[in-house]
Amino acid sequence: MLLPIGTKEVWVKGYQCKTTLTTPQLVQTFLFNTQLDKATIIKDIGQSHFLQTIKYPPVSKISLLAQEAITTDTSTHILGYRCKALQLKWTDGSVYDILYTDELSLTVNQFELGFKNVPGLVLSYTITSAKDMRVKYQATKLDLSPLSLSLFTINSELYQAIDEE
């Protein structure tokens, strides 16, 4: 059984993407533009606020081993959208079990690096590590309303800068 430990929100406008993970311990926001080679990470831990700029996408030692469509006898729907199943296996031993819809088309669908080749919008995914630890994310709301560009603006004066790792 998977217990909810937080929420993750995703916003997309044009080539920009913003994801915010909120848990009782921290709030972490990740912002990137697919036309640039960097991303910004903001971490709020208690009263401490940190900002980090990183190369994005990163030079990764992990690569995709296999991508396999999974056919099922049942039809899965999330938020009213028919979903297809896909499994991604990675060289680090992790596995992503993905449910996506091809009924929606966004300019940025890879709000996770692993979604780059998924032919639609991911609405649910479970990451299983090589040590069999599982984390599941599932969309609970989808809003197709226009977004303000200010949503992607950061006031860097509010954060302590940390060096790129």
Positions of predicted regions on the chain:
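Extended soluble regions of mature proteins
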Residues: 1-165
